[in-house]
């Protein structure tokens, strides 16, 4: 199972049911469980990471705020943003947490490079940036040697809700998205490229795709 990956396209979902399903998957998986990546667009929501501080919520208005158990501070999820959750057995892949963070940043950088968008990671703030503007947020959690949570890549979305928070705890952090930089407006195209880069970086040899309707909305 080390080189097998299951890619599930969840479509558009509320945050909490997917978060609960990630927990259930991680709690019940064993050494034989293949790694999975879940691709989803969330309905509008602010999520606070474990390090989240209330003062970074400036004016959330009618958008709900959910306390999450991922790393990091507050961020926004909404339609037009590609969220990828990485359910990976790190011990099996012989990856440390820092290795996984670097791999995820590199797969985003490589994905954007396919669209002639130059981007980079920052040592002081996880995520991916284009000329100082943030295009991708990153937050993970590890349990039983397995990762969950993941990344949020701005593709073709309304960025204005980010003005209601200090994104990832940084006052005045400017956000940018793929479609503004000459890349695709279609999330499905970006999903394909992202999965391709992930398979290359982590050496998966068998990849199974599914449109997952069964993620339980507990």
From Swiss-Prot:
InterPro entries noted in UniProt: aa-tRNA-synth_II/BPL/LPL, BPL_LPL_catalytic, Octanoyltransferase, Octanoyltransferase_CS
Catalytic reactions of this protein: octanoyl-[ACP] + L-lysyl-[protein] = N(6)-octanoyl-L-lysyl-[protein] + holo-[ACP] + H(+)
Signal peptide bounds: none
UniProt KW GTP-binding keyword: no
EC number assigned by the record: 2.3.1.181
Top-level taxon in the UniProt lineage: Bacteria
Chief location: cytoplasm
Span of domain BPL/LPL catalytic: 31-206
Listed GO MF terms: lipoyl(octanoyl) transferase activity
Residues under site feature: Lowers pKa of active site Cys: 134
Top EC class for this record: transferase
General remark: In the reaction, the free carboxyl group of octanoic acid is attached via an amide linkage to the epsilon-amino group of a specific lysine residue of lipoyl domains of lipoate-dependent enzymes.
Protein name: Octanoyltransferase
Organism field: Vibrio vulnificus (strain YJ016)
This protein's encoding gene: lipB
